[in-house]
Amino acid sequence: MSRYRGPRVKIIRRLGALPGLTNKTPQLKSSPINQSTSNKKISQYRIRLEEKQKLRFHYGITERQLLNYVRIARKAKGSTGEILLQLLEMRLDNVIFRLGMSPTIPGARQLVNHRHILVNGHIVDIPSYRCKPQDFITIKNQRKSQAIINKNMNFYRKYKIPNHLIYNSLDKKGLVNQILDRESIGLKINELLVVEYYSRQA
């Protein structure tokens, strides 16, 4: 399944706020999952499916990519759900978004694809690059790159940067300080339902 490129507002009306996809927050349409349903019982499969879709659309990844992340998380020690979220949060495009360098993850992905971003002094043009503690995220030293990032930072500096990241506004340098904890996830999600959804596939 390819990456979604359709109307973003339509998605968040159905699934709720997905800050990685869009910063718009339209009024939610009535949803059988968001309100009590006396006449219709919602299947557990559908509930798990919608939680899975939240991850897909928020992080802007394909079905195959998400399944691969679940498989990696299952093989690691610890809570599969938390490790899955850590893997997604440590993607370079998401780190750029959480640092405030881009208003959305698709926007961050463009910055990476267009070679505006350096990791530890080297250009990285792979949005799925997995960042690790002590990685430095900087901007390419060109006027166009600097202008794009400065515009984003000035507009989105009101948003709080999570505890596992540090941004130095003077040097325009981001640092992955540590592996994030569950409380730092910027999305309302039940990751256990996602793991259950893939229980027969991963």
Swiss-Prot record:
It holds the Pfam family Ribosomal_S4. One of its GO terms (cellular component) is chloroplast. The keyword Plastid applies. InterPro entries: Ribosomal_uS4, Ribosomal_uS4_bac-type, Ribosomal_uS4_CS, Ribosomal_uS4_N, S4_RNA-bd, S4_RNA-bd_sf. PROSITE patterns: RIBOSOMAL_S4, S4. Keywords: Chloroplast, Plastid, Ribonucleoprotein, Ribosomal protein, RNA-binding, rRNA-binding. Residues 90-150 form the S4 RNA-binding domain. One of its GO terms (biological process) is ribosomal small subunit biogenesis. It is found in: Plastid, Chloroplast. One of its GO terms (molecular function) is rRNA binding. One of the primary rRNA binding proteins, it binds directly to 16S rRNA where it nucleates assembly of the body of the 30S subunit. PANTHER family: 30S 40S RIBOSOMAL PROTEIN, SMALL RIBOSOMAL SUBUNIT PROTEIN US4M. Belongs to the universal ribosomal protein uS4 family. Part of the 30S ribosomal subunit. Contacts protein S5. The interaction surface between S4 and S5 is involved in control of translational fidelity. This is Small ribosomal subunit protein uS4c. It comes from Canalohypopterygium tamariscinum (Moss). The lineage of its organism: Eukaryota, Viridiplantae, Streptophyta, Embryophyta, Bryophyta.
